[in-house]
Amino acid sequence: KYRINITGSNSKMLSNEIASTLGGRFVIMNIYPYSFSEYLIANHMKKNYLDVISTKDKADVQNQYNQYVTYGAFPELTEINNKRVFLNSIYQTVYLGDIITRNKITNDFAVRLILKKIAESITKPLSFSRLTNILKSTGTSIGKQTVINYVGYMTDSYLLFTLQNYA
């Protein structure tokens, strides 16, 4: 009896296309970035960072937090010195491969601008209507449904996660 593990970053390939190829005999396991606690453990810090007492410990945790929010929490990043190159490579692969090429998008400016505006608005709610208006203000003719589709492609590719407003 053999066990074969197939890994990849493309959510659609793993969930939709592989299903027919493997005849339904597969398990999808999503691996997410570290939580801050996991990140500290991976960087050889105390597990219970809330109990740090010394000024040095507080400074170390603050430094780790700054790294966490600046570079993210991919498990591989703990071992990589040039984090920006690694992250840019992931971005280019996901952006160009999983979003632009796979979905046959010709207006990549709109996708870049949507992603930029979402990143700039990370601390406050942002609606599809607002994103559409921002794009229109730059002279880009795009409909709300297209914006919704583009954000969906980004979500499918795990480039971003959305939170729904249920109020």
Task: Please name every model-derived segment.
Residues 79-167:
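Accessory nucleic acid-recognition modules appended to NTPase machines
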Residues 12-28, 40-45:
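Short regulatory helix/loop adjacent to the ATP-binding pocket of P-loop NTPases
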Residues 7, 39, 69-72, 154:
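Conserved RecA-like P-loop NTPase ATPase core
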Residues 31-53:
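Conserved small helical "lid"/interfacial subdomain of P-loop NTPases
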Residues 10-14, 33-37, 167:
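Conserved nucleotide-binding/hydrolysis micro-motifs of P-loop NTPases
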Residues 51-95:
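Amphipathic alpha-helical "lid/sensor" segments that cap RecA-like P-loop NTPase cores
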Residues 3-9, 30:
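Structural recognition of the conserved hydrophobic beta-strand(s) that form the central parallel beta-sheet
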